[in-house]
């Protein structure tokens, strides 16, 4: 029993080992097969990826090749175009040179023809001169025979007539010299005035009756006019200024004789253009705001002016009236600038004579104060100025200076005389005041017209603001003696036909040039 059991156990062990071996072998075979399959799959995927990379590399290479080829073709094309342009320029330059060569050949031929014509004309002129000399000699002989006068006797008669004419001119010139000598008798006073003028110089503002407002574009003109013109009518009604909207690009012209109103309208219109909202209510608001700004500017101008001159304790109302003079002009001269200039000049003159400099400056600054409001109150600016100075309790010397600076009242102090002198200096210095532009231009044109009406005058120029006329004559027609006679004749016509202040200098210029070239 034990033997059978052992044998059975051994057989079972052997069978189990065999079954285990077979099972393990199958498992191993299966793993090997799976591993081979995985390996084959990996190899296949590697081949596919390698093929894809190969194709991608080929595509990139083709793209690079195409890009390089395109760039090369563009470069070649640009170079061809540049070469073509250079070739065209060379061809054009060659054509220009050919045309210039043809032109030069034509000019050379023309010059040769002209030279030949000039030679023939010179020969003809020489023949004519010879005939003229013979004719003049025969005419002189015939005149001597007819008039029963020799050449010397006729010459004596002509010289006597010229001598009489010159005697008249000499008498006139002598009288003018005497007048100038009398004017030179005040040399010392002129030296003092000249010193004062040299120590002070003021700028000058030209008179104008228009202002210009720049616009961002021409479409703004339609907005300024408004529907049926209501905006422009509102602005003109509120300011009293005419708005001129014409073909001037991006600009509107404001026209009016009251500078304060014109400045108010200018500020209001600039604010409206900047704001963009333009309608009657907004216009009224901006005009009122601009009026306040102008009033503030007037006040600040008065304060700054008194500070600049060094005047203290001036009444605030008088200071504001002083600021209004910034917007007044007289013959092209700004009244405030003129008053500042008179104040400085009066102070300098007072310092030279040992008078009160501060009081002289105060009187000079306020001498034209009436001009600030003379269009609002009846009476001359002198009367209004005296009334204002009295109202605000100014110094009696200041009041007398205002009253007497135009000679309406007798001056009772040295300072009043100095203020009148400074006023005359400021108004009379060259460039301070101007006449009407139209009259000024007409006078200059008449000067040149008179000068150019004489035979032998080549050109004339009115210079120094019409205080001198320079006449350039043709030297072959006007000799030196004729130049003096021409200057006298033009001077007489100017005196007879023109009205002008001061003197006009007549200068005749005769120039002869002889030019030779050494080779």
Swiss-Prot record:
Keywords: Cell membrane, Endonuclease, Hydrolase, Membrane, Nuclease, RNA-binding, Transmembrane, Transmembrane helix. The chain crosses the membrane at residues 4-24. The keyword Nucleotide-binding does not apply. It is a single-pass membrane protein. Residues 335-428 form the HD domain. Its EC number is 3.1.-.-. GO terms for biological process: mRNA catabolic process. Pfam families: HD (PF01966), KH_1 (PF00013), RNase_Y_N (PF12072). This is Ribonuclease Y. It comes from Lysinibacillus sphaericus (strain C3-41).
